[in-house]
């Protein structure tokens, strides 16, 4: 049994987790080790997660997919397996949920702070910028995103959502709706 409990993050140091974390940087090599261990005939992945990073979820999903190609993978869902928790589960051969498991929440979102008003109006900070191209300061918190940048972010989120729904559709053998 491999326990995957907590927020899904890329790195234990990334600051997104509010406690225990499922770090793709740890989980992926662990699953590869289980895949290569001839004494392990199947893997039960116990998932208890509200989700987290879409990127980290994709990395773990790929590792589960590689593992599944060599031996059976069974997901056992705990209290919740939502969003990224479901993402990392959907590639398994079998998924079992408790009657009270909260699961699903198939979607992604992005949240980007704009603290420019706080910095300039409240704190009186001014910013001078020197950049090498028009996207060099993309994502700075010292100004709001412009229309082109917002469209780029929207497209990125939409691509991520389409990938997520395709993973679920393929893994569970159901149509995307």
Q: What annotation goes with each model-predicted range?
A:
Residues 176:
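Catalytic machinery of carbohydrate-active enzymes
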Residues 1-72, 80-86, 90-171:
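Small-residue-centered hinge/linker elements
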């Amino acid at each position: 049994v491999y326990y995957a409990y907590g927020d899904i993050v890329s790195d234990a140091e990334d600051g997104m987790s509010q406690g225990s974390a499922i770090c793709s940087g740890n989980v992926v090599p662990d699953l590869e080790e289980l895949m290569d261990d001839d004494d392990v005939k199947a893997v039960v992945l116990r998932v208890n997660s509200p989700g987290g990073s879409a990127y980290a979820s994709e990395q773990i999903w790929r590792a589960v997919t590689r593992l599944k190609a060599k031996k059976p993978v069974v997901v056992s869902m705990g209290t919740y397996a939502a969003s990224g928790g479901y993402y990392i589960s959907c590639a398994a051969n079998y998924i079992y949920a408790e009657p009270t498991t909260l699961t699903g929440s198939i979607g992604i979102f992005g949240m980007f702070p704009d603290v420019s008003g706080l910095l300039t109006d409240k704190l009186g900070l001014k910013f001078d910028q020197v950049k090498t191209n028009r996207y060099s300061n993309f994502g700075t918190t010292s100004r709001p995103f412009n229309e082109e940048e917002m469209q780029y972010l929207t497209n990125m989120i939409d691509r991520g959502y389409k990938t997520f729904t395709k993973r679920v559709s393929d893994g569970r053998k159901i149509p995307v709706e």
